[in-house]
């Protein structure tokens, strides 16, 4: 074998890079392709740096330039071009990229294959994902939304079972502990529903632990007052994987909307049966009576930003009933734990599910985009927030003028 054949291909991943779900997805992808690819990370500018630097270091990590007035996930093109020139990647993967300028530039100026990890898309933006040469879909409903794309890969999400695993069996505690992960957005995660349901349960000999990256002040006052219950603990802390799942017996996750719901496979892998809405993607990981319980959705509505999938909400009374059912039947809980662990090992092993990802990435080709598709995306991007776009252009112009003045000053000196 020649030395050239033995060299690894290079992949550039453009992503959030700190204690957030998107970054954990990027780390999981890196973990399964690192033996086949030399990985370069472009951490988008303007996003928070990691509070746990030991968990967020990387050999080839570049923090992108921050621009004022930039929309979420904006990539500064001058900085990106320099990074691209220095790294010379063979393929690029964008993780939760909402801004389209960099995609448009690549399709018009480069032959590097580009792909997207699918999470956020609206009714209006979905068609523009045709500009990508490949898509990574980790849930069935994402795959369904992009079934017309010729390279939409369905790679079922899971968990790193070497990191997320059940604790050794202990003597059954008297008080059952429900665990809920509120993340950065307690409303979207259904934290208010969990607190109300817990307060209205018939079984009172139980506890509730809520782990969040924000404080309870984000809750409405009526919900916040319920936290005075000494049985409820709110933990505000950024905790690296495997998190705090080991503190609970049952995972309660009435999420109103999720792209994947990363915490579900993690909780299940840690041996916690889960209570979730009977709604995708939550019901792709939890099966009623097998490794948890479904709660019927009471209402659905469209989110203001036009996200493709609707919000959903369960009734507090129905959620409380499901929590009571588990709390009052310890035998069923034990059965669900055992079944859940078995199901997770068989179906939610991320390394097994993503074993073929490297081969797919190595075989991808760049496809030329039509002028019509490029123009449509340009019009969409321009309409997202024209005022911010104008401010960004003005800022870049002023920076350039300032740099010229400084250069003249030093030259004259």
State where each predicted segment sits:
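Aromatic "clamp/platform" in nucleotide-sugar-dependent glycosyltransferases that forms part
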Residues: 256
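Conserved donor-binding/catalytic core segment of Leloir-type glycosyltransferases
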Residues: 14, 170-189, 195-199, 209
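Short hydrophobic beta-strand element within catalytic cores of glycosyltransferases
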Residues: 273-276, 286, 293-294
């Amino acid at each position: 074998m020649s030395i050239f054949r033995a060299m690894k291909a290079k992949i550039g991943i453009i992503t959030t890079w700190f204690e957030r779900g998107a970054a954990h997805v990027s780390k999981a992808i890196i973990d399964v392709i690192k033996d086949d690819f030399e990985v370069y990370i472009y951490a988008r500018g303007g996003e928070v740096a990691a509070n746990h630097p030991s968990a967020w270091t990387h050999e080839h990590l570049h923090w992108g330039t921050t621009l004022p007035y930039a929309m979420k996930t904006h990539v500064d093109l001058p900085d990106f071009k320099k990074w691209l020139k220095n790294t010379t990647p063979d393929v690029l993967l964008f993780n939760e990229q909402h801004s389209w300028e960099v995609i448009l530039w690549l399709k018009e100026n480069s032959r590097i294959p580009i792909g997207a990890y699918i999470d956020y898309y609206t009714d209006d933006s979905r068609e523009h994902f045709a500009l990508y040469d490949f898509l990574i879909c980790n849930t069935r409903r994402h795959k369904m939304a992009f079934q017309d794309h010729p390279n939409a890969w369905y790679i079922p999400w899971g968990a790193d079972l070497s990191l997320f695993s059940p604790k050794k069996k202990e003597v059954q505690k008297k008080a059952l502990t429900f665990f809920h992960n509120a993340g950065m957005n307690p409303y979207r995660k259904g934290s208010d529903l969990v607190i109300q349901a817990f307060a209205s349960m018939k079984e009172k000999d139980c506890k509730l632990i809520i782990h969040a990256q924000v404080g309870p002040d984000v809750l409405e006052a009526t919900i916040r007052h319920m936290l005075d219950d000494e049985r409820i603990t709110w933990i505000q802390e950024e905790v690296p994987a495997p998190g705090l799942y080991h503190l609970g017996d049952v995972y309660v996750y009435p999420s109103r909307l999720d792209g994947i719901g990363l915490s579900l496979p993690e909780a299940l892998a840690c041996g916690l049966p889960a209570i979730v809405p009977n709604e995708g993607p939550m019901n792709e990981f939890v099966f009623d009576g097998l490794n948890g319980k479904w709660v019927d959705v009471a209402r659905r509505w469209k989110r203001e930003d036009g996200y493709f999938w609707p919000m959903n909400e369960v009734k507090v009374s129905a959620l409380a009933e499901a929590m009571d059912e588990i709390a009052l039947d310890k035998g069923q809980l034990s059965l669900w734990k055992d079944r859940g662990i078995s199901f997770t090992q068989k179906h939610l092993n991320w390394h097994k599910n993503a074993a073929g990802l490297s081969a797919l990435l190595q075989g991808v080709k760049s496809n030329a985009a039509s002028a019509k598709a490029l123009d449509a995306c340009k019009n969409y991007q321009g309409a997202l927030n024209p005022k911010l776009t104008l401010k960004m252009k003005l800022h870049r112009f002023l920076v350039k003028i300032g740099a010229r003045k400084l250069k003249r000053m030093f030259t004259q000196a």
